[in-house]
Regions:
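Cell-envelope/extracellular polymer assembly enzymes that use nucleotide-activated donors
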Residues: 46-49, 79, 238
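Acidic helix N-cap motif at the loop->helix transition within catalytic regions
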Residues: 62, 89-98, 118, 150
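N-terminal membrane-anchoring/stem segments of glycan-assembly enzymes
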Residues: 1-44, 424-428, 442, 446-463
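Membrane-embedded multi-pass helical conduit in multi-pass membrane proteins
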Residues: 40-42, 311-461
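A conserved acidic beta->alpha catalytic loop
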Residues: 75, 84-93, 112-115
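Short, acidic, metal-binding catalytic loop of nucleotide-sugar glycosyltransferases
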Residues: 66-77
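Long helical/loop segments within the catalytic core of UDP-sugar-dependent glycosyltransferases
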Residues: 103, 110, 117-136, 149-233, ...
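The conserved acidic donor/metal-binding loop of glycosyltransferases
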Residues: 142-146
Length: 482
C-alpha cells in the first residue's frame, strides 16, 4: 500500500480510539470486585469536620446541612463547617439558624474576602478545621449534595489503612425532575465515575477526587500544606495527584453514593465543563514529568492510565483528524476509504453496544432510567451511520460514489457533529430555539457536545483567559433518589 494511503488509514482509525479505550476501561472495571481496597479497610470512625464552601446557596444549604446531621454517623464525631464566601442572599441566615439549633455541631465561618472562588474559600475552612486538634479527618463537599445513609461510614472505613490519604464517593445526578440533559449527565457519570474510577482503582491511580465528596485524613492534608491549590481551575484533580505523588493512596468507594444537582440547560453545562476542561489542560501541563513512566511508579504514570487520560483530552483532535483523513482518502482512493469507514464505524457500534449492556451491570438503577440517552449518547446520526456500516458488512456492498454529497457527509461526520452540537447550545437561548436545540443535540450526540467543550477549553487556554470561577447555579432540585 502506498505510504500516504497507509498513513491516512492510521489517522482515520484514531476516530475509533475513544470507544475502544472506553470499552477497555469498562472491562477492567469488572476486576474491581476482586481487586479493591476493602480487604484493607476496617471499622474506623474518625472525628470528622465537613467543610462546605458556600456562595449564595440559600436554595440548597439548609437541606444539605440537615442531611449531613441526620447521617448514620456518631453525633459526637461529626461537625459541619460552612464557609460562607460573603454570600449576598439568605445563605448566612439558613446556616445561623442551624448553628442555634445544633450548638457545637454546626459552625458558620464567613470568609475575609468573597468572590475569589471555591479553592480560596476552602482554604479558609481548612485552616479553621486543622487549627483544632479535634479533627482527625476532613470531608470536603459541595453545598448542594445529598448523602445516602451509610455513605460517610463506607468512606471512613478506608482510613483504617494508614497508607490511604483520601477517599471519594460515587456522585450521581439527582435532580427530582430530570430532563433529557440531566439524563445524559446521569449516563455520563455512570461511565466516568462508576466504571472509570473502578478501573483506576484497579490500576492503582485515581484521576480525580470528586469535589462533591472527598474525604481526607488529617495527615494527608497536613502533608499537602493544609491548603488546596488556587492556581488552577482543577484544584480537586491537583489535590488527587499530589496525594498520590506524595506516596498516599486515593481510593474510590462505589458504595458511597452522593446525589447532586447538575445543570439543567446547555449554557450552564457549557460554563461548568469549560472550567473542567481548562483545568484538565492545566493539569496535563503541570504533570508532564508524570505521564507514561511506568518504571518510576504504577498508577498515575502507568501506560493504561495515561492512555485513558489523553484519549479523553485529545478526542476532539482525533475526531477532526480522522474526518479530514477520511475525506482525503475518499478523494484519492475511494475504495480504501469505504473499507476504513466501515472499520471505524463498526468498531464504534460494537463498543457502544458493549458499553450500553455493561451499564446495566454497573448501575442498573441509572441504566434503566436513562437507557435511551445511553443509546443516543453518540447521536442519532452516528447510530444510523453504524447501522449503515453494518449493512455494508453483511451485504458486501460498497458505499455511494465518492463524488456523491452523502459520501462527503458520512466521511466528515466525526468532525461536523461537534459543530452541530455547538449550534444546539447556541440555539438554546434563541427565540423558539429550545426545541431545535434539543433536536440537534439528539442528532449530534451528547458525547459530541462534550468534545466541542473540550475544544473550546483548548482555545481559552491558548488565549490565556483568566482562571475565573464560573459558579453553577443551584435550585434545590437534588433528591436522594431519582
Amino acid at each position: 500500500m502506498d505510504p500516504l494511503v497507509l498513513s491516512l488509514v492510521v489517522v482515520v482509525m484514531l476516530g475509533a480510539l475513544a470507544p475502544v479505550v472506553g470499552s477497555l476501561q469498562v472491562a477492567l472495571a469488572g476486576i474491581h470486585g476482586l481487586r479493591n481496597h476493602l480487604r484493607r479497610s476496617g471499622a474506623c470512625l474518625p472525628r470528622t469536620v465537613v467543610v462546605v464552601p458556600a456562595w449564595n446557596e440559600a436554595a440548597v444549604i439548609g437541606a444539605s446541612v440537615d442531611r449531613l446531621l441526620a447521617m448514620d454517623y456518631p453525633a459526637d464525631r461529626l461537625r459541619v463547617l460552612v464557609v460562607d464566601d460573603c454570600s449576598t442572599d439568605a445563605t448566612p441566615d439558613a446556616v445561623l439558624e442551624r448553628v442555634v439549633r445544633h450548638p457545637g455541631r454546626v459552625i458558620h465561618l464567613r470568609t475575609s474576602e468573597g468572590g475569589r472562588g471555591k479553592a480560596h474559600a476552602l482554604n479558609e475552612g481548612l485552616a479553621r478545621a486543622l487549627a483544632d486538634e479535634w479533627a482527625e479527618a476532613v470531608l470536603i463537599i459541595d453545598a448542594d449534595v445529598q448523602f445516602e445513609d451509610g455513605t460517610l461510614r463506607r468512606m471512613t472505613r478506608h482510613l483504617a489503612d494508614p497508607r490511604v490519604g483520601a477517599v471519594t464517593g460515587y456522585i450521581k445526578e439527582g435532580s427530582h425532575d430530570p430532563g433529557f440533559l440531566n439524563r445524559f449527565i446521569a449516563w455520563e457519570y455512570l461511565d466516568a465515575q462508576a466504571a472509570a474510577r473502578r478501573t483506576q482503582d484497579v490500576l492503582g491511580g485515581l484521576a480525580c477526587l470528586a469535589g462533591g465528596a472527598q474525604l481526607h485524613s488529617r495527615a494527608n492534608l497536613e502533608a499537602l500544606g493544609g491548603r488546596i491549590d488556587t492556581s488552577t481551575l482543577a484544584e480537586d484533580t491537583v489535590t488527587t495527584f499530589e496525594t498520590q505523588l506524595a506516596g498516599r493512596r486515593a481510593v474510590f468507594e462505589p458504595a458511597a453514593v452522593v446525589w447532586a444537582e447538575e445543570p439543567p440547560d446547555l449554557h450552564a453545562l457549557w460554563k461548568q465543563r469549560i472550567r473542567w476542561g481548562r483545568g484538565n489542560v492545566q493539569v496535563t501541563r503541570r504533570y508532564l514529568s508524570t505521564w507514561f513512566r511506568p518504571w518510576t511508579r504504577r498508577g498515575l504514570s502507568g501506560v493504561l492510565f495515561g492512555l485513558s487520560w489523553f484519549t479523553v483530552l485529545l478526542q476532539p483532535l482525533f475526531m477532526i483528524a480522522s474526518a479530514v483523513a477520511l475525506l482525503v482518502l475518499l478523494a484519492i482512493r475511494d475504495d480504501v476509504a469505504w473499507v476504513v469507514f466501515r472499520a471505524v464505524w463498526l468498531t464504534h457500534g460494537v463498543c457502544y453496544l458493549f458499553l450500553v449492556l455493561s451499564a446495566f451491570v454497573i448501575d442498573r438503577q441509572v441504566a434503566t432510567r436513562c437507557w435511551r440517552e445511553g443509546v443516543l449518547f453518540p447521536g442519532l446520526v452516528s447510530v444510523v451511520i453504524i447501522g449503515y456500516a453494518a449493512v455494508q458488512a453483511v451485504t458486501g456492498a460498497w458505499g455511494v460514489s465518492g463524488g456523491h454529497p452523502v459520501a462527503w457527509l458520512l466521511a466528515g461526520w466525526l468532525a461536523s457533529c461537534m459543530a452541530v452540537a455547538w449550534l444546539a447550545m447556541r440555539l438554546e437561548t434563541a427565540r423558539g430555539g429550545r426545541w431545535w436545540s434539543r433536536a440537534l443535540l439528539y442528532l449530534a450526540g451528547y458525547g459530541s457536545f462534550l468534545c466541542v467543550v473540550t475544544l473550546a477549553a483548548y482555545v481559552r487556554e491558548l488565549r490565556g483567559s483568566d482562571n475565573r470561577w464560573e459558579k453553577t447555579e443551584k435550585r434545590g432540585r437534588a433528591l436522594l433518589a431519582s
